[in-house]
Design a protein with these regions (language model features):
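Short helix/loop capping segments that flank catalytic or ligand/cofactor-binding pockets
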Residues: 1, 83-84, 163
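Interdomain helical connector at the RecA1-RecA2 junction of SF1/SF2 helicase-like NTPases
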Residues: 1-71
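"Short basic amphipathic alpha-helical interaction patches in structured regions
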Residues: 4-9, 75, 86-90, 117-121, ...
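Short alpha-helical segments and helix-capping/turn motifs at coil-helix boundaries
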Residues: 56-60, 86-87, 137-139
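Conserved strand-helix element at the start of the C-terminal RecA-like helicase core
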Residues: 62-90
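Short loop/turn segments immediately following beta-strands, especially the blade-tip
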Residues: 92-95
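Conserved RecA-like P-loop NTPase helicase motor core
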Residues: 97, 101-222
Length: 222
């Protein structure tokens, strides 16, 4: 990221220690606040919104953005952060996030290269009646097409623009089904169109906590 966000270190914010199921964020309370914020449920902000009469379009609460978040990809700094996020999302008080099947596509347990893909496809299924969050720190960010992915959260520092764009392109492939009603083999229902690739077009439209970019495959970053 750039500009006013240069001083914010995503890798430090999402720093975690411990292995796999024991992994925890070093700034767990702050990450929890962030999880509450992106769904518009952070209590101190509610008072502010009431006073100002405005409410930013938080990703997991805004009706315009929710359709893009049924199947999302969260790009984190490292394996420990991926497992720490999975552990935090699974905690009892995070009831909202229990609606989502969380897949950790990171570390040795996820396998090498494309070996990490089958668990993702299995969790997504047909994509209609499931919700998923794929956590990764690099796996499945190149050479992979999962048509149901429609958003990516950039939760790490990226020095290379190529890495940013390669990851962003993971959520820009089209998603359609043929013969959706079973009575017309020539009919095709488009559920997600291919994005234009203009990654910065909408960055100014949604400011604040979530900077949104892209068209049919939005990119969220702090």
């Amino acid at each position: 990221s750039g500009g006013e966000f240069d001083e914010f270190d995503l890798n430090a914010f999402f720093e975690a220690t411990g292995g796999y199921k024991k992994s925890r964020f070093n700034h767990k309370s702050d990450v929890q606040k962030w999880l509450d914020i992106i769904r518009g449920q952070y209590a101190p902000k509610h008072t502010e919104f009431l006073k100002t009469g405005t409410r930013p379009p938080f990703p997991y609460s805004d009706a315009r953005l929710l359709p893009y978040l049924q199947h999302s990809f969260w790009f984190l700094p490292n394996v420990a952060a991926c497992y720490a996020m999975a552990n935090l999302l699974a905690e009892k008080h995070n009831v909202f996030w229990h609606e989502y099947r969380v897949i950790v596509a990171a570390g040795a347990e996820a396998g090498i290269g494309l070996d990490a893909l089958p668990p993702v496809r299995k969790a997504i299924g047909n994509g209609f009646d499931t919700k998923t969050i794929t956590l990764s720190c690099g796996k499945l960010t190149t050479g992979v097409t999962v048509s149901q992915w429609s958003s990516i959260l950039m939760l790490r520092n990226l020095k290379s623009p190529e890495t940013y764009f390669q990851a962003a392109f993971r959520v820009q492939s089209p998603w359609s089904i043929k013969n959706p009603n079973g009575d017309n083999p020539n009919e095709e229902e488009i559920l997600k169109r291919s994005a234009s690739g203009k990654i910065d077009d909408r960055r100014r439209e949604f400011g604040g906590v979530s900077a949104v970019a892209g068209t049919d495959g939005p990119v969220f970053s702090l």
